[in-house]
Every structure is written in C-alpha cells, then in structure tokens.
UniProtKB/Swiss-Prot annotation:
InterPro entries: DUF480, WH-like_DNA-bd_sf, WH_DNA-bd_sf. Belongs to the UPF0502 family. This is UPF0502 protein ESA_02280. It comes from the Bacteria. Pfam families: DUF480.
Length: 217
C-alpha cells in the first residue's frame, strides 16, 4: 500500500480526521490545536506527550507529502491545517463515513475488536449493529487500492479477533499481543483498586453514621 506513515504522522492524521467530524467548528486546526488533540488522555492509545516542535515537524512532512494543506487568509492570524488524506478534491483515496470512522479510530487507538470499535467510533458514525461494522472492515481489508486493515490472529482466551490498520506497515502481532495482555492486567488491577476504595468508603460511612448516632444521644 502506498499510504505509509510513521507513528507520529498516523496520530496527526487520525486527529485531523476526528476533529473534522466531531468538532467542525474548530476545524481546520492550528499547531496548538493539533498538539492538544495528539496529547489527549482519552480516546488515545498510546497516550503521547508530544512537544510543539515534534508536531510542527510532523505537520511540515505531511504538507510536503500532500496529506495536509495549510489554510491562511483573511481573518486567520495563525496558520491552520486541514487534511487531504482522504475525500479531498484532488486526492484519490475515498472512504465512506463508516470507513472514515473505523480508520480514524484504528489510527488513534491501534488494534481493537469489532465491539470496541463500534463503541469508540460512535461519535463519528453510528453502526446499526456489529454485522454492519464487520462488513465495513471487510471492505477495508479487501479493497483493490488497499488493503487498509487486517484481522489479527485471535489471542488465546479471547472471544473476538482484533483488527489493525496497515498505514504503518504490517503489525507486529507479538508486540500487540503483549501490549494487550499488559492492558488487561492494568485494567484488572484498577478494578481491584476501585473495589477496595469503595469498601473503604462504605466502612467510613458506617463509622460516621455510628458517631453521629452517639452524638445525638
């Protein structure tokens, strides 16, 4: 596939696509806007902490490669950027709204199951059911000008296979599996911590009620 990006380029493109749909009133984006979008703590995997210089360098590279263009003119005191990656007037890459939502979510969060994709892509496109989403994934995986996504081998103990975009090359399945396993462990630890805190709060509430009861006697 001719459309290949570095990890930072993929993050910037994903942010551009996301903001174009979800916050059109703030689009095109300034450099600061792109930095903020790239470093979001939510809906990003991995969470990044990019500097303005890193983002500016990435923007410049994408402009040179004709995946972005600068927007400046009357009323614009700062340079802003908009994507030419897909569905642009002069570009040859065309995606449906469903495909844009899936590609964007994969660019921003990496490998995911159909269930995860349906939930996380809902702000950009509402899929009627999982079958409709899987149909769109299959189209992305088999298009003549692609493939753009691939289905990863199902991991032991998992019910669903995950899908990954191919805009950064063939995925390293071993690394992705290890990352997913670590994420699962982190989630389990967080759940246990929350349950422990809830129990502690309940005990403190009982003590407080008992103390108030004694004071009222």
């Amino acid at each position: 596939m001719k459309h290949q990006f570095s990890a930072l380029e993929a993050r910037v493109i994903g942010c551009m696509l996301e903001k174009q749909v979800t916050t059109p009133e703030q689009y095109p984006l300034s450099v600061n806007g792109v930095v903020t979008a790239c470093n979001q703590k939510t809906n990003r995997e991995p969470v990044m902490n990019l500097s303005e210089a890193q983002v500016q360098e990435t923007l410049d590279q994408l402009v040179k490669r004709h995946y972005l263009r600068t927007v400046s003119g009357f009323g614009n005191r700062v340079t802003k950027y908009e994507q030419r990656f897909c569905n642009s007037e002069f570009g040859d890459l065309k995606f449906s709204p469903a495909e844009v939502a899936l590609v964007t979510t994969l660019l921003l969060r990496g490998a995911q199951t159909p269930g995860e994709l349906r939930s996380r892509a809902a702000r950009m496109h509402e899929f009627s059911d999982t079958a409709a989403l899987e149909s769109a994934l299959e189209t992305l995986a088999t298009r003549e000008d692609g493939p753009f996504v691939t289905r990863l081998p199902r991991e032991p103990g998992k019910r669903e296979s995950r899908y990954m975009h191919l805009f950064c090359g063939e995925p390293d399945t071993a690394t992705l599996a290890a990352s997913n396993e670590t994420a699962g462990v982190d989630t389990d630890a967080l759940t246990a911590r929350v349950e422990a805190l809830e129990l502690e709060v309940a005990e403190l509430r009982e003590r407080l009620e008992s103390l108030l009861g004694h004071l009222g006697e």
